[in-house]
Regions:
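Membrane-interface helix-loop junctions in multi-pass transporters/channels
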Residues: 1-127
Length: 127
């Protein structure tokens, strides 16, 4: 039962982080054509999960409860695949097909890249 509570608590924190950080990024970019706030939190979450999941797996730095809290709860709520999908569909629905395609490409390529970079960083720094 503690594990479920910790995942929920992490999810609450991650959701608040997503709201605050995503809004800040969107306002900072001044772009209303592309959802840079969602892209930014997805990139950050991908980078962090690359680092932290790698350290958890290779170095055993997290207990099962901590993994649930951080990886499933916080980072699961921070990254926003459902929001990404909704915003992309909205772009397509509004006739901005090039923007919708760019958003899909940017999210997939950059998030995969940042998971890889996070993993590489974790493996090189924390040997």
């Amino acid at each position: 039962m503690l594990g479920v509570f910790l995942i929920g608590l992490g999810g609450f924190i991650g959701a608040v982080m997503r709201y605050a950080l995503g809004g800040w990024i969107q306002a900072a970019t001044g772009s209303y054509r592309l959802p840079f706030g969602t892209l930014g939190v997805n990139i950050l979450g991908s980078f962090l999960i690359g680092i932290l999941a790698t350290l958890a797996r290779t170095r055993g730095v997290m207990t099962a409860e901590t993994r649930g809290f951080v990886l499933i709860g916080m980072l699961g709520a921070l990254t926003t695949f459902s929001t990404f999908s909704y915003e992309t569909l909205g772009l397509a629905r509004d006739g901005a097909l090039a923007s919708a395609a760019a958003n899909v490409l940017a999210n997939v390529v950059l998030c995969l890249l940042f998971v890889w970079l996070g993993r590489a960083l974790a493996l090189s720094v924390w040997r």
